[in-house]
A protein has these predicted regions:
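Short, exposed beta-strand "edge-strand" segments with a Pro/Gly-rich flavor and a Y/T-containing core
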Residues: 18-24, 34, 115-137, 227-239
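Phosphate-handling DNA/RNA-contact segment within nucleic-acid enzymes
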Residues: 43-187
C-alpha cells in the first residue's frame, strides 16, 4: 500500500531544496521515495480511491481513515514522507515536518489512531544497507561486527548516505528493548549510537544510561555520539574505517 501510495505523491521545490542541502543526490531521493505530502482534501480522496481500484485495502493501514462522508482519506501534515523499510518492505512512514511539533520534535509517525476506522502506527525500526548486502546473511553472520544506530530516520539516512555502511534507524524515544533486539540479532560487538537534537533535549538521561548499561553488561562496547553537524555526520567513521569493521 505505502509503495503505491508514495508513487502518487510528488516532491515540491521547497522539500527538494531541503533534501539537497542535506547532501542527498537526485538518485538517492528517488530511490528512497522521499515525497512531499499532498494535503488537498479532494486530491487525498482521489489518491485513496485509486489505491482501492488497484485492489488495495486501506483499513488497518496507519495514516488512513474514513472521513465524515465515509470515503477514505489520510492524515494531513506539512512535511516529507520518509519510508521506514525493513526486510525489503515499507513497514510505516515517518514524517519530517516543516514546522516543529510538540516538544520541538521535527519527526512523527504517519498515524490515524484518533480518526474513524483509523490505525495507530507502530514503532518500527529501519535498516539501511547496500544492495549487495543480503538480508539473511546480515542477520545470520557468525562474524562479530560494529553497527551504527541513529535515533531518527532522517539522521539514519544522512549517516548511510555519508558512509555507505549499514545503519539502523529508530524513533527518537530511545527504545531500549528495540536496540537490544537489533544488536543481538546482528551479533554486534560494538555499537555507534548517534542521537539527534530532539533526543538529547527531551529524552531522559536515565533512559540513555539504562540502554548503555544493558549493552555493556553483554560485553558490547558503546560509542555514544551527539549529532551536532548532522549534514557531515559519519565522516569520522570513514577516517577510522581501517581500525573497525562496520557491517
Amino acid at each position: 500500500v505505502y509503495r503505491n501510495f508514495l508513487e502518487m505523491q510528488n516532491l515540491n521545490d521547497l522539500h527538494y531544496k531541503k533534501l539537497k542541502e542535506m547532501n542527498f543526490t537526485d538518485d538517492y531521493i528517488k530511490e528512497n521515495q522521499f515525497k512531499s505530502i499532498e494535503n488537498n482534501k479532494n486530491k487525498k480522496k482521489e489518491i485513496c480511491m485509486k489505491l482501492q481500484e488497484q485492489g488495495l485495502k486501506l483499513d488497518g493501514i496507519p495514516g488512513f481513515f474514513q472521513d465524515t462522508d465515509f470515503k477514505w482519506t489520510y492524515k494531513s501534515h506539512k512535511g516529507i514522507f520518509i519510508p521506514v523499510t525493513l526486510n525489503n518492505k515499507i513497514q510505516g512512514l515517518r514524517i519530517l515536518l516543516d514546522n516543529e511539533y510538540r516538544l520541538d520534535t521535527e519527526n512523527i509517525w504517519f498515524s490515524s489512531n484518533n480518526e474513524y476506522n483509523g490505525t495507530k502506527a507502530s514503532n518500527w525500526p529501519m535498516i539501511l544497507k547496500d544492495n549487495t548486502v543480503n538480508w539473511i546473511d546480515m542477520y545470520n553472520s557468525d562474524n562479530s561486527t560494529s553497527i551504527i544506530i541513529a535515533t531518527e530516520m532522517i539522521l539514519a539516512h544522512k549517516l548511510f548516505n555519508n558512509t555507505n555502511k549499514t545503519v539502523i534507524g529508530i524513533p527518537n524515544n530511545i527504545d531500549k528493548d528495540l536496540i537490544l533486539s537489533i544488536v543481538q540479532r546482528m551479533n554486534a560487538s560494538e555499537v555507534f549510537l548517534y542521537a539527534d537534537k530532539y533526543t538529547i533535549l527531551h529524552t531522559s538521561t536515565l533512559m540513555y544510561e539504562n540502554t548503555v548499561k544493558s549493552l555493556e553488561r553483554q560485553n558490547i562496547k558503546v560509542e555514544f555520539r551527539v549529532a551536532l553537524n548532522e549534514n557531515d555526520i559519519g565522516s569520522e567513521l570513514k577516517e577510522n574505517e581501517k581500525n573497525i569493521k562496520i557491517a
